[in-house]
Each structure stands twice: as structure tokens, then as C-alpha cells.
From Swiss-Prot:
Provenance organism: Candida albicans (strain SC5314 / ATCC MYA-2876) (Yeast)
Subcellular localization(s) per the UniProt record: Nucleus
InterPro entries reported in the protein's UniProt record: Nro1/ETT1
BP-aspect Gene Ontology terms: positive regulation of SREBP signaling pathway; regulation of translation
PANTHER family named in the record: ENHANCER OF TRANSLATION TERMINATION 1 (PTHR28290:SF1)
Protein name in UniProt: Enhancer of translation termination 1
Family of this protein: Belongs to the ETT1 family.
Acidic residues bias (residue ranges): 235-252
Highest taxon of the lineage: Eukaryota
GO cellular component, one term: nucleus
Keyword rRNA processing: no
Length: 421
């Protein structure tokens, strides 16, 4: 890595000074933060052209994305650099700034909202500024795919931080200026235009980028928040003393009123299905690239595998209760499923999950091996006790767990002990 200063940095600072500035940032005023950002020194990849300011800006943006994303000073640095480039461009009548400039600028403005989540007025201001910037970029670069990605990200973050975060169980849809499901539909429509534009250009490189994949993760996070909204044990201290009780509590949630802003999303499978359909399409688009990232492909396959496992949980539970639990003797159906129906559905879903988990396997990451073994064990549990199908799955899972346990010095001994008689 080569350390270079950007236009926003007038002189290089020693590492110790940089750390002190970052430490002081947390208590600095906005003006002080702006001043401090002018002292920022960042390590950028060696391939970044030191004479190309847009290339440097992209490197700074990438540095933030690859970090813990918890440094407001760095975000302010990106914004100050964008401001400087914009002023220079206006005063010197240079060539128009490229679309990627507007995308980075807009994302940085929206990112500031994450450091001020308790100040709703500020959050709104940041998103207004971010969306104005992305629209300004789209006026100059209609249908630019990077700007469409940026717009989708910003809209999803806005839904989470500006619209969902302030809600309580007593919230009413009448209190909002827009319905959240309509906002979500609008954001996803922009993402669909990303897919359509890539297809039109026959260029799928936009999907070989974790920043684009972040969109699907952001949607998944929103759906998770909605799904768990109102859980009775939210805010537990996390003690292990009553784990079994806590697990039961986690399943109990408060029913949302039909007038609640999240009611429509929580009581619909529409968005979960959208997530899966477009994650499949994401994988298809990745596979169209000759040199697509293997790491990204594994990540997408892992997410798909986990989604099928999650979907299998209800029928799996129904099958095991009706098959083995004495409390359910004489009961023919649970959750609208018979024992045989639940067994068949579970087997199909876990088989699909296994297919994707195998594609997600990383020889350098034993955790991915164990995910495969655990899915095999779950699938084995759905067959008759001591059947050939069950024995074959258990044996294969045992081999995988032993290998993972050996290379990790016993990390997965508990999983092995649970499997072995």
C-alpha cells in the first residue's frame, strides 16, 4: 500500500498524530470536524493514480467501504474533497465531472446520517442533500448505472433510518407523509432499472462489486427489522442463564395493528420473494462474467443457502413434532401441514440449501464446511431412523466435521459430539 495525501490533505501527518485526531473527533464540533478532515491522511491502493483526482476520490471511497464504516471523519473527508472538486470545476470551466463523482458524493452525504441517528432533523437533511446530488448526477448522466445503484442504496437507507427507526408499536400510518411499503416499492424499482440497464448494455460488471450486493443485504436487513418489530424480549440483557426460556420468548411477537406503518410489509411474502428472485438473478449475472469475483459468488450462494434453510424451519419443526413428540400424538396437522407434507417440503428446501452451500464452500474457511455438514445432518433427520439415506448423510457430515475440527484445533468438537453416538 502506498500512502498518499489527497487534495483535502495539505501535508502528510505522522501515524500517531492521525490517531490522536480521530480520537478527538468524537467530541469535536461540526466546524472542528471540518477543519480536522483537512488533516486526514489515508492509505490508498498502489494502483490509484496520484495525478488523477477522481481516481483518488474513488480510492478514498473504497477505503471507507472496506473499513468498519464507523469513522465520521473519513466521511467528512470524502465530502470536503467532493466540495473542493465541485468548486474547482465550476470556477475553471473544466469538463463535466463524471457520474461516479456524483455517486460517491451522494453516498457520502447519506452515510453521515448513520452518525446522527438520534437527530431526526439532521437525518432528513442528509438524505435530502444526498438525493438532490444523485438526481443532479442523473440529469447530466441519464440512466447511468452507478448512479442508479447509489440511488437505490440511499433510498433503502432512508427507509431504515428516517422512516422505520423512529417508529413505536403505537405508530400510525397517518403520522407519515408516505407509506413505507410504497417507499420500498420505489427503491426496488430503481434497482430493477439497474438490472435492466446492465442487460441493455450487455455489461454485467456492476454486479462484480460488493457495493451493489450491499443493496440486497440492505433489503434483507429491513425485512429482518420488520419481522422482529415488536418482539416481546427486545432489549434482553443476553444472559445465558435462561437460554431455553429466551429462545421461546424470541418467537413471541406483538401483532401490529392494521394501521401500523409496517403492517403491510410484515404480513406479506412479496418482499421476501423479491429478495430471493433478485438474489438468484444477481448470481446469474455474476456467472455471465468471465473473471467475476469467486468470493462474491460464494457470498451470494451462502445467502441463498441460508434463505432456503430459514424457509425450511417451519415445516421441519412440524415434521419433528408430529413424528417424534408424544405431546402431538393423534394430531394430524400443524401449521396446515401433515407429517408427510412437512417432510417432503423440508427435504426439498434443505436439498436446495445444500446445493448453494456447496457452491459457497471455501477451502480456506472451515466455517463454510461446517455449514454444509449441519445442513446434511438436518436433511438426515428427515429420513427414517437408521435408513440408508440417513446413514449416508450422517457419515458424510461426520467426515466434514472431523476435518474442520482438526484444522481448527477442536473448534467444532461440540458439533461432533452431538452427532456421534
Amino acid at each position: 500500500m502506498a500512502k498518499r495525501t489527497l487534495g483535502l490533505a495539505k501535508a502528510a501527518k505522522a501515524k500517531k498524530q492521525k490517531k490522536e485526531q480521530e480520537h478527538q473527533e468524537s467530541s469535536a464540533s461540526p466546524d472542528e470536524e471540518s477543519s480536522s478532515s483537512n488533516q486526514l491522511t489515508i492509505e490508498l491502493p498502489e494502483e490509484i493514480d496520484a495525478n488523477d483526482e477522481i481516481s483518488q476520490l474513488k480510492g478514498l471511497h473504497k477505503t471507507y467501504l472496506q473499513s468498519e464504516r464507523d469513522n465520521e471523519l473519513l466521511v467528512n473527508g470524502i465530502i470536503h474533497e467532493c466540495d473542493r472538486l465541485l468548486r474547482e470545476n465550476d470556477s475553471e470551466n473544466k469538463q463535466p465531472l463524471p457520474a461516479v463523482f456524483h455517486a460517491i458524493y451522494a453516498i457520502a452525504l447519506a452515510e453521515l446520517s448513520k452518525f446522527h441517528t438520534e437527530e431526526l432533523d439532521k437525518v432528513k437533511e442528509f438524505f435530502i442533500a444526498a438525493l438532490e446530488r444523485v438526481e443532479s448526477g442523473l440529469e447530466k448522466n441519464p440512466n447511468d448505472i452507478n448512479l442508479l445503484v447509489a440511488k437505490t442504496k440511499i433510498l433503502l437507507d432512508q427507509i431504515s433510518l428516517q422512516y422505520i427507526a423512529p417508529l413505536t408499536l403505537e405508530s400510525d400510518v397517518k403520522e407519515l407523509d408516505k407509506e413505507i411499503d410504497e417507499l420500498l416499492d420505489a427503491a426496488l424499482s430503481v434497482y430493477e432499472s439497474v438490472e435492466a440497464r446492465a442487460k441493455e448494455l450487455k455489461d454485467y460488471s456492476i454486479f462484480d462489486d460488493s457495493e451493489t450486493l450491499d443493496i440486497l443485504e440492505a433489503l434483507d436487513d429491513i425485512l429482518d427489522i420488520v419481522d422482529n418489530f415488536g418482539k416481546e424480549n427486545q432489549g434482553d440483557d443476553g444472559s445465558d442463564e435462561d437460554d431455553e426460556e429466551d429462545d421461546d420468548e424470541e418467537e413471541k411477537s406483538v401483532e401490529l395493528a392494521e394501521t401500523h406503518p409496517l403492517y403491510k410489509i410484515k404480513n406479506s411474502d412479496k418482499y421476501d420473494q423479491w429478495w430471493r428472485d433478485h438474489t438468484h438473478l444477481y448470481l446469474d449475472n455474476l456467472e455471465k462474467l468471465e473473471n467475476g469475483s469467486p468470493e462474491l459468488k460464494r457470498e451470494v450462494c451462502h445467502r441463498l443457502g441460508q434463505s432456503y434453510l430459514q424457509e425450511s424451519e417451519v415445516p421441519y419443526s412440524v415434521f419433528t413434532k408430529l413424528k417424534y413428540d408424544d405431546e402431538y400424538d393423534g394430531i394430524e396437522e400443524l401449521e396446515g401441514l401433515t407429517e408427510k407434507e412437512a417432510q417432503k417440503i423440508s427435504q426439498e428446501l434443505i436439498t436446495k440449501a445444500l446445493d448453494y452451500l456447496k457452491q459457497a464452500k471455501d477451502e480456506e474457511d472451515p466455517e463454510t464446511w461446517v455449514s454444509i455438514a449441519e445442513a446434511m445432518i438436518s436433511l438426515g433427520n428427515l429420513y427414517e431412523v437408521d435408513s440408508k439415506e440417513q446413514e449416508d448423510l450422517y457419515l458424510e457430515a461426520e467426515k466434514i466435521l472431523k476435518r474442520a475440527n482438526n484444522v481448527t484445533n477442536g473448534k467444532f468438537q461440540e458439533e461432533l459430539d452431538n452427532l456421534l453416538p
